[in-house]
């Protein structure tokens, strides 16, 4: 009888040893989890004209109200060549083609261009909430002795979308002074 009990115990231990173990997932700190925002995403076409040169580009504008604006410029085949990230305090311009980026406050940025660019204007451009309410926007900025005219054709209004929007990591780009671009 005791021999049978020992055999049953050994068989149960072998069966229990072959069972799968539950894996406990690691605890992720709250700071490292990106939060969801309601983001207005717009695709548009922009035409940039400078001293006899005309460039057409597709742009994607993402705006999280009163927080972040991201403008991606894709002049050919959907390849992002330039990215502009703006917060209410600063503007980050990333040139992916040359591997460079520059950070500037609106004060520094506006020392080199006219008319002045503000957070409010940038947010209105990206969300197509311009005062005239039209489907086209025409902007003209001058820096150094060069004038850039930008025409934006907005598509039909796109809906707010829940999205995780993150700033582009700049550690893989070389930081330069904004005046080298302006």
Regions found by a protein language model. Give the residues of each.
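Sec-dependent signal peptide recognition
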Residues: 3-11
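Bacterial Sec signal peptide processing site at the extreme N-terminus
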Residues: 12-34
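Non-transmembrane domains of secretory- and envelope-associated proteins
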Residues: 21, 95, 132-182
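Post-signal-peptide N-terminal segment of Sec-exported extracytoplasmic proteins
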Residues: 35-75
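Short, solvent-exposed coil/turn segments at beta-strand boundaries
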Residues: 37, 62-68, 86-90, 132-140, ...
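Short, surface-exposed coil-to-beta transition loops
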Residues: 55-58, 79-81, 147-151
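An acidic-aromatic
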Residues: 69-120
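Charged, gly/pro-rich active-site loop segments
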Residues: 116-136, 140
């Amino acid at each position: 009888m005791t021999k049978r009990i020992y055999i049953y115990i050994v068989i149960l231990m072998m069966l229990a040893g072959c069972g799968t173990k539950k894996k406990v997932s690691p605890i992720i700190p709250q700071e490292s989890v990106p939060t969801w925002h309601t983001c207005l995403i717009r695709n548009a076409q922009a035409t940039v004209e400078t001293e006899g040169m005309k460039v057409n580009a597709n742009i994607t504008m993402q705006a999280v109200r009163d927080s972040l604006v991201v403008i991606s410029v894709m002049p050919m085949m959907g390849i992002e060549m330039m990215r502009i990230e703006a917060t209410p305090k600063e503007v980050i311009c990333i040139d992916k083609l040359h591997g460079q980026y520059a950070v500037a406050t609106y004060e520094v940025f506006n020392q080199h261009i006219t008319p002045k660019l503000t957070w409010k204007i940038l947010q209105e451009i990206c969300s197509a909430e311009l005062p005239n309410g039209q489907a086209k926007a025409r902007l003209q900025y001058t820096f150094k002795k060069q004038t850039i005219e930008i025409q934006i054709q907005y598509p039909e209004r796109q809906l707010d979308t829940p999205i995780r929007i993150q700033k582009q990591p700049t550690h893989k780009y070389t930081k330069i002074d904004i005046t080298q671009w302006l």
